[in-house]
Amino acid sequence: MDPAAPATRMTSSFTINISTPSFYNPPKKFAPVVPPKPKINPFKAPEEPQSLVPQENSAGPGLHQAFVGKVGEMPPGVDHDDFVLPPPPPSEESISPPSSSFPPPPPSFGDEGLGSPSGGSFPPPPPPEFSEPFPPPIEEFFPSPPPLEECVSDTQDLPVPVPPPPPPPLPSPPAAPPPKPSAPCEAPKPAPVFPKSSPPPAFPKPEPPSVAPKAASSIFIPKPSAPMAVAPKPLAPPPVAAKPSGPVSFAPPSPAPHTFSPDPSAPAHTFSPKTVTFSPKSAPHTFMPKPSAPVTYPQKTTEPPAEASQSSPKVTPAAKHEAPPPTVPSGGRAPGFSFAQQRERPRVLEKPRANLQGSEPEHEPTVEVQVERTRSLGPQTESGRSPGAQSTGGKDMKPLPEGLRSQKPMSDGIHRTGGQHSGHKVTGQQDQTLGSQGLNMKEVEELEMLTQQLMREMDKPPTAEAHSMELCGFCGRGLSRTETVVRAGEHLYHVACFTCSRCDQQLQGQQYYESAGKPLCDECYQDTLECCAVCDKKITERLLKAIGKSYHPSCFTCAVCKCSLQGEPFIVDDNKLPHCVNDYHRRYAPRCCVCGDPIAPEPGRDETVRVVALEKNFHMMCYKCEDCGCPLSIEADDAGCFPLDGHVLCKKCHTVRARAALG
């Protein structure tokens, strides 16, 4: 067998004619129902009792044939006239409630010529012409299942015959622990769990035509590891398959980490809303977990749960022909929903924020929470349904209300259902709160901006010249922003007004000089310059004025020694010629009558000290007695000068010369 194949494919087929028991008056025959992939032989099981194997009446021994086909397709070797349309589905009274165990199969039946059904069991079927390999045990795993769209399209396009109503149920063996209510709506289990009283079947057993084809066409609970294997539990109640009035749900395969697998031996369940599906028909009576189970609502979902939620609303083709079941309100009892579940329903799903819709009934918050969490697992479409719900057709799927279509999950958990419910109410409350507190920041900023604008308008009232920048420096008229202006210094001028103040020459783009705050051209500016008193040239650079004349700094020198007098003291003679101090004293200072040198100021001093006696000039050091040479005092005392006959004498020498003249 090829390991890459999804399941074991049979190369031959059986042509089986099934006859009804003797207590059924009209003989009815049904076509063999081939389950979806994997294609395994449901009529050859090691543990299968012989009473369940149908007998062959028309086909003799050695005519066993099998074929590979689809559900509902007629075998090529069988006459189509032998198959009669199935009767209507069984009523609700003839089926046991979901809480009880699965009813045992009806008694074996055979042809009318073989005896009554109460007689012994039928003889075993003749051996096939070939040896078929036994299917793998339940411990072995098959490859991953094919895409869900392929399986759904195969089962959706072909009609499935509905079996006749089953006989009244017989006393059932000891019932196993009742299944948890959340099992029918949960994702497929990792591995089928059976009660301890019965061994786990290796593969699906062929049920009698009264019940088995219906269970195979209504509910598929495949194993996650096996590719789309039909695994009905004989002792476990089918979710809602036998009741046409109950909601029909189809749980596609999903990866094991995201499935909910209740164990009959475990008292508590682990409920995760990632695999909870919502159908518009059964929304009010959604199954709830027990209070003992931890309820977790993850905010982020992964891709496998999104695929499971998209295809969860899909139904089987057999459910299309049935009338949609009536919607059971939250206060009533739905099929398969016990009163213990209603008492143990947790209140965590009924969020008080969803009650903002005043016109909604009491059970609506639960429906809105379910829809919101279901929509968060899969992508939304324009009509508010998941892609899986759109693929099943519109016969048994009711359109969602307008409030549920626009519902989207929010990060903070607040529902925004519809355009006229809680969103507007919350906005109104916020507006009232802001109004009671006063102005908000936006209104305060607008008020402040208007106030500042009004103050600026009051300070600068609008005038005709408001658009002009400044006034012209010559004519005093306003300068427009559109015309060309000339900036000279700190003033602006019109082009026509910016001319030389003497010759009226245009100065735009030319070199100009400013004299007394007025622009001048180069020639007019040169005319305003002074000439040097020494070289008689225009002084264009630094100007030095002395003795009422203008000089170049290099031309102002001493008249005797020609040294520069810039920054030096000088003395002007009678001819108004500048002289340095030394040359002036040497030339014009008085001379000493003793030494004959000019009497000039001492070095480092500006003052000249001289002694005048007998109309003669003396240096301070040269003022002495002529006879004895002692220094004379400038004061009138005994140490002073006592002149005699034009001589400068001290008192002692004066006495001597006077006595000598007398003697």
From Swiss-Prot:
This is Zyxin. Adhesion plaque protein. May be a component of a signal transduction pathway that mediates adhesion-stimulated changes in gene expression. Suppresses the transcription-repressing activity of hesx1/anf1. InterPro entries: Znf_LIM. Signal peptide: none annotated. Residues 122-148, 160-211 have a biased composition (Pro residues). Residues 342-353, 360-375 have a biased composition (Basic and acidic residues). The keyword Transcription regulation applies. One of its GO terms (cellular component) is cytoplasm. Keywords: Cell adhesion, Cell junction, Cytoplasm, Cytoskeleton, LIM domain, Metal-binding, Repeat, Transcription, Transcription regulation, Zinc. Pfam families: LIM (PF00412). GO terms for molecular function: DNA-binding transcription factor binding; metal ion binding; transcription coregulator activity. Its main location: cytoplasm. Coiled coil: none annotated. The keyword Transcription applies. Interacts (via LIM2 domain) with hesx1/anf1. Residues 298-314, 377-393, 427-438 have a biased composition (Polar residues). It is found in: Cytoplasm; Cytoplasm, Cytoskeleton; Cell junction, Focal adhesion. Belongs to the zyxin/ajuba family. At the early gastrula stage, expressed at a low level in the animal hemisphere. Expression rises by the end of gastrulation in the anterior part of the embryo, where it gradually increases by the midneurula stage. During neurulation, expression continues most intensively in the anterior part of the neural plate and around it. At later stages, intensely expressed in the brain and at lower levels in the spinal cord, eyes, nasal placodes, within somites, and around the cement gland. Residues 35-438 are annotated as: Disordered.
